């Protein structure tokens, strides 16, 4: 199947039909004789697919062009912003230089004033400078002491938190045991008690004797013992919770006190720095008196700090004592739980429940251990992060120093080569703009070419529509001609049948007439032929001659002959095939 004729038509842009209208196929353009409707449809589909592909390519090209244009615009905006930043930095640097020059001039003037003064005020100044140095040494000592105390307090806080976690685990175990006991009132309830009530409960717990074992038959006694043990365990749990709350409150208080101490230390440092600066600038006795007052206030504040630190130590010792009491309570509770387990080890169902409880406790212990390991890992990670932060801070400080040095060098270079840099930047920007304009021009040319190809394709689509209309017309003509040919063929067959009938009738008539003429001849020539055998022989001979003559007459008129070219064919089927080929 060749696509050359349609491609030629699409390239020229002319319509494929020179003589449109309803007519025979011989009047159509000769290039369409070799095509079938299926081939034309395939070519139409291919052209539509190519058109769609071209449209998609145009869209992609437009999107790429837009993206490049946006990138160029963003690049130009970034360059503008960088220029503005450089200009702002240069202005700030100039302002800093001016401020530094003013400060240098002021310091020079102050140095000149100090030189003009006598040696006595200089000695007074040196004597006055000794005082802030002593203050600074005292502040540094206090700082070291406070830092050591802070570290010690942090360690104690960590211990308290670990003990708190252990106590919470014990409380959860006790809750599980109480829930497994089956009593309706053994759910975990927080009981807020005052300090006097807690002390009374502790005394009662110490004075109360341990319950003795009873017989396993008496169920009522067992239930009473279980209830009393549950109540006792609830009291112990509430006391443990109170201890934990008190420990948390003390830890919070200690943290607040540490923060206040740090703030006071920072205030002292600021005051010491302020005093040292005032002493360097001025050398008068009034300032010395103020500094004496400040020293007294600093000493009083140091004393208050030491008192607070001692109070904090006392509170920590109290927390430790309470924690030791809680540990003793924990041991007692464990012993009582073991006793209860021994009592309740009679029935197999209770044994199964105990085994399940043991299994759940082991699971919880494993979970607690895993959580502790995770906490340790997190602590190690935090320590590593802290070390990394320290290293990063050191590197940051180094980078800041290098940055300051670089800024100074940049200021010097900008003063020397500002004009050169501006010229080079302008040249580079102009070159980049020229390249961008060239790229835009080339893209515009490509866009124009694509538009031309689109116009050609639209024209080709119009020609394809005309071709489709012509194909429909030709198909209708072909179907009409086929119907007419079928009708003509039917009429020919009917005529052939009529001819055959007429020929038979004619033969019959001729045979009858020949017989009559023979009879007349026989009657006329009866004298000549007397023998009957001779007459029969002549009669038979004449009949044979007539039959031969009548047999030759229908052979002279052929029935199966083409109406267009006159070719004689043996059968009707071959005649139909020949007629279709001859007409087409």
Swiss-Prot record:
- Superkingdom, natural source: Eukaryota
Output the Gene3D superfamilies linked to this UniProt entry. L1 transposable element, trimerization domain (1.20.5.390), Nemo cc2-lz domain - 1d5 darpin complex (1.20.5.990)
Q: Where in the cell is it found?
A: Cytoplasm, Perinuclear region; Golgi apparatus; Golgi apparatus, trans-Golgi network; Cytoplasmic vesicle, Autophagosome
Whether Iron-sulfur counts among this entry's keywords is no
The Basic and acidic residues compositionally biased stretches are 267-295
Stretches for region Interaction with Rab8: 58-219
Q: List positions binding Zn(2+).
A: 562, 565, 578, 582
One term under GO cellular component: trans-Golgi network
- Residues of the region (Interaction with MYO6) are 415-524
Annotated motif LIR, positions: 186-191
Q: Which residues carry this modification: Phosphoserine?
A: 187, 345, 530
Q: Which residue ranges does the record annotate as region Disordered?
A: 1-32, 267-302
Question: Quaternary structure?
Answer: Self-associates. Interacts with HD, GTF3A, TRAF3, TBK1 and MYO6. Interacts (via UBAN) with ubiquitinated TFRC. Interacts with active GTP-bound Rab8 (RAB8A and/or RAB8B). Interacts with TBC1D17. Binds to linear ubiquitin chains. Interacts with LC3 family members MAP1LC3A, MAP1LC3B, GABARAP, GABARAPL1 and GABARAPL2; OPTN phosphorylation increases the association (at least with MAP1LC3B). Interacts with RAB12; the interaction may be indirect. Interacts with TBK1; this interaction leads to the Golgi localization of TBK1 and its subsequent activation.
Purpose of the protein? Plays an important role in the maintenance of the Golgi complex, in membrane trafficking, in exocytosis, through its interaction with myosin VI and Rab8. Links myosin VI to the Golgi complex and plays an important role in Golgi ribbon formation. Plays a role in the activation of innate immune response during viral infection. Mechanistically, recruits TBK1 at the Golgi apparatus, promoting its trans-phosphorylation after RLR or TLR3 stimulation. In turn, activated TBK1 phosphorylates its downstream partner IRF3 to produce IFN-beta. Plays a neuroprotective role in the eye and optic nerve.
For this protein, the record's PANTHER family field holds: NF-KAPPA-B ESSENTIAL MODULATOR, OPTINEURIN
Q: What does the record's miscellaneous section state?
A: OPTN E59K transgenic mice exhibit profound gliosis in the retina.
Mind telling me what this protein is named?
Answer: Optineurin
Q: What organism does this protein naturally occur in?
A: Mus musculus
């Amino acid at each position: 199947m060749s696509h050359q004729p349609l491609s030629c038509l699409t390239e020229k842009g002319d319509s494929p039909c020179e003589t449109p209208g309803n007519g025979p196929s011989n009047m159509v353009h000769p290039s369409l004789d070799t095509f079938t409707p299926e081939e034309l449809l395939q070519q139409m589909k291919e052209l539509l697919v190519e058109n769609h592909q071209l449209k998609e390519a145009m869209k992609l090209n437009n999107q790429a062009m837009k993206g490049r244009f946006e990138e160029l615009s963003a690049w130009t905006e970034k360059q503008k912003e960088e220029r503005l930043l450089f200009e702002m930095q240069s202005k700030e640097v100039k302002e800093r230089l001016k401020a530094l020059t003013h400060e240098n001039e002021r310091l020079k003037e102050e140095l000149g004033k100090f030189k003009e003064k006598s040696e006595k005020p200089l000695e007074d100044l040196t004597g006055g400078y000794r005082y802030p140095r002593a203050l600074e040494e005292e502040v540094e000592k206090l700082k070291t002491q406070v830092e050591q105390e802070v570290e010690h307090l942090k360690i104690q806080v960590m211990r308290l938190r670990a003990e708190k976690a252990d106590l919470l685990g014990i409380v959860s175990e006790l809750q599980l045991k109480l829930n497994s006991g089956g009593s309706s009132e053994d759910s975990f309830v927080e009981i807020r008690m005052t300090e006097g009530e807690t002390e009374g409960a502790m005394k009662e717990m110490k004075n109360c004797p341990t319950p003795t074992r009873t017989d396993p038959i008496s169920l009522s006694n067992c239930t009473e013992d279980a209830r009393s043990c549950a109540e006792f365990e609830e009291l112990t749990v509430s006391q443990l919770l109170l201890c934990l709350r008190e420990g948390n409150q003390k830890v919070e208080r200690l943290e607040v006190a540490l923060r206040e101490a740090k703030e006071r230390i920072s205030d002292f440092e600021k005051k010491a720095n302020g005093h040292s600066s005032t002493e360097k600038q001025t050398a008068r006795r009034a300032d010395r008196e103020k500094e004496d007052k400040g020293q007294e206030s600093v000493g009083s504040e140091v004393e208050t700090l030491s008192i607070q630190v001692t109070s904090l130590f006392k509170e920590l010792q109290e927390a430790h004592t309470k924690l030791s009491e809680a540990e003793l309570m924990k041991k007692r509770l464990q012993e009582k739980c073991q006793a209860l387990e021994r009592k309740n080890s009679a029935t197999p169902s209770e044994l199964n429940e105990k085994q399940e409880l043991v299994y759940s406790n082991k699971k919880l212990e494993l979970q607690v251990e895993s959580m502790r390991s995770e906490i340790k890992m997190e602590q190690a990670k935090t320590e590593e992060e802290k070390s990394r932060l320290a290293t990063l801070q050191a590197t940051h400080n180094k980078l800041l120093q290098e940055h300051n040095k670089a800024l100074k060098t940049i200021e010097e270079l900008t003063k020397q080569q500002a004009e050169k840099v501006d010229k080079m930047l302008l040249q580079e920007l102009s070159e980049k703009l020229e390249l961008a304009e060239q790229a835009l021009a080339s893209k515009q040319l490509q866009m124009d070419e694509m538009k031309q190809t689109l116009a050609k394709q639209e024209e080709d689509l119009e020609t394809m529509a005309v071709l489709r209309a012509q194909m429909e017309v030709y198909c209708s003509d072909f179907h009409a001609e086929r119907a007419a040919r079928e009708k003509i063929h039917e009429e020919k067959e009917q005529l052939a049948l009529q001819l055959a009938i007429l020929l038979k009738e004619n033969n019959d008539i001729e045979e009858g007439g020949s017989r009559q003429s023979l009879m007349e001849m026989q009657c006329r020539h009866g004298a000549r032929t007397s023998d009957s055998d001779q007459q029969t022989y002549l009669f038979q001979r004449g009949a044979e001659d007539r039959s031969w003559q009548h047999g030759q007459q229908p052979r002279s008129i052929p029935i199966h002959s083409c109406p267009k070219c006159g070719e004689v064919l043996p059968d009707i089927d071959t005649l139909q095939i020949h007629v279709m080929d001859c007409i087409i």
